Amino acid sequence: NKINYNSKIIALLPGSRKQEIKKMLPTFDKISRNYSKYLFVIAGIKEIDKKFYLKFIKNKNIKLVFNQTYDILNNSFAAIVTSGTATLETALFGVPQIVCYKSNPISYFIAKKIIKLKYISLVNIIMNKKVVEEIIQGDFNVNKISNEINKILEGKLRANQIENYLKIEKKFTDE
């Protein structure tokens, strides 16, 4: 699948497990319909069949590309990322992002009781402050994500994320 890198790309990283993709991708698909000026590109992984992804994509303007995550990120203007190592990778590529996660409500409730974390994204955990917006569980909806994506497409929040990404890089290179 060829990507037009002259387009402004919003990378979609829906996760690496079928369960995550099933929960995340339908909402990512709906969001993409509100941003016709942008090309949305899903970073697919080879372990998951193309047909599985396509079940959740209704917008024909979304591209599905396999095994090119770094190439996609290197050419992206922004990203919507499922929480995990991809959030740190996205930051190291300097791409402003919104971090999302939605799990089974019971699993989430149990995890919340057992694990006392202030943040779910590696970017925020490493920086010990909110650098990227985290949208989880009940907040995970088209309106909330769209409001947040608008903030990183231009303006102070976009610049702030990029500035903090440089600090993350520095933390790794100084140690």
Predicted segments — roles?
Residues N1-E175:
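Nucleotide-activated sugar donor-binding and catalytic core shared by glycosyltransferases
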